[in-house]
């Protein structure tokens, strides 16, 4: 399609957008009395209007039923998390038995490491990407130290080539092959938080398995953003947060994927608690643990119902729309944003550099823009004008036009504000 940098053309794209009505299902903050242009769905998604209703429902049941709400609430609490299984499975490309909702992301990665990081003999190394999200770095380092190894020896980082912004798949595969039988685990972020690069998870997973390692993925920036086929790719485990693209609310519950081939392995190590116990016998208070025959066996404590309520509200919208429709809109709106950025760059003779891959198969919703010659003054100007973006050192603005609630006219309007901000210096 031939794009045009005009308001009329942007409105035309909005009129053709099959999921544009969902914009009205979210609450926008306001600046100067106008809805903001919201580019940070990759940090915290907007609040769905139905979220309050779902939370109020739980509050009402708690007030009227108290402890009896576990079994007699409108959506009973003891099995509340089970309402997520099929819907989440469709988002991440899994069987319903392979997904569960519990805890938060780094907590879940630690728990999954109990099962999937089992160093012994010469097989003790973890392969990850350089400059992973800091929480992943801390988690991996602490796990390595816990097992008695030095991070400088046990952690192998995949590096970008000098002068390049993104990782090359062939370099990742080469590193996996080089480490070989010393590798216990490959653990990478499926979408790089800084550049927005999407990794070839299927190919990398196979390469890790070929050397006898487990392969897991941190999908903090992947779930609800990109096409995932975790079962088909034979991924061992994955975890993600729900408050970014999945709009569940600040710090809300994480999701986990555990490949079904591990569900009934009696020898798999795992930290256990009563909510992973056979649900038919859970309240018999038996001394011996009988695991659920699903990913729920990895649950430890009962679910935080008030937290899960807004998550369920959002997830039901995902189920209505479906990932294919979201990805179709995502590709189009990100391409239009990219076009607008290039147009403004030429008009003002600036020197923006989009460090996210240009190939739509290698990126999701996020475009990371390196502002050569610009600084935080421009970022602050955008924020003051109601353009909510995200700053990452050094000099990068991350823009993530979430397809559920961002419009094509937002992209045009952002371009005009950006141009004004540069020219007004």
From Swiss-Prot:
Record InterPro entries: Kynureninase (IPR010111), PyrdxlP-dep_Trfase (IPR015424), PyrdxlP-dep_Trfase_major (IPR015421), PyrdxlP-dep_Trfase_small (IPR015422)
Gene3D superfamilies the UniProt entry points to: Aspartate Aminotransferase, domain 1 (3.90.1150.10), Type I PLP-dependent aspartate aminotransferase-like (Major domain) (3.40.640.10)
Cofactor(s) required for function per UniProt: pyridoxal 5'-phosphate
Enzyme Commission no: 3.7.1.3
Binding-site residues, pyridoxal 5'-phosphate: 105-106, 133-136, 218, 221, 243, 274, 302
Chemical reaction(s) catalysed: L-kynurenine + H2O = anthranilate + L-alanine + H(+); 3-hydroxy-L-kynurenine + H2O = 3-hydroxyanthranilate + L-alanine + H(+)
SUPFAM superfamilies reported for this sequence: PLP-dependent transferases
GO molecular function: kynureninase activity; pyridoxal phosphate binding
Uppermost EC category: hydrolase
GO biological process: anthranilate metabolic process; L-kynurenine catabolic process; L-tryptophan catabolic process to kynurenine; NAD biosynthetic process; quinolinate biosynthetic process
Superkingdom of source: Bacteria
Keywords from the UniProt entry: Hydrolase, Pyridine nucleotide biosynthesis, Pyridoxal phosphate
GO CC annotation, single: cytoplasm
Keyword Ligase among record annotations: no
Pathway membership, UniProt: Amino-acid degradation; L-kynurenine degradation; L-alanine and anthranilate from L-kynurenine: step 1/1; Cofactor biosynthesis; NAD(+) biosynthesis; quinolinate from L-kynurenine: step 2/3
Pfam family, one: KYNU_C
List of residues that carry N6-(pyridoxal phosphate)lysine: 244
Family the entry assigns: Belongs to the kynureninase family.
UniProt-listed HAMAP family: Kynureninase
Function: Catalyzes the cleavage of L-kynurenine (L-Kyn) and L-3-hydroxykynurenine (L-3OHKyn) into anthranilic acid (AA) and 3-hydroxyanthranilic acid (3-OHAA), respectively.
Quaternary state and interactors: Homodimer.
Protein name, per record: Kynureninase
Organism: Christiangramia forsetii (strain DSM 17595 / CGMCC 1.15422 / KT0803)
Gene expressing this chain: kynU
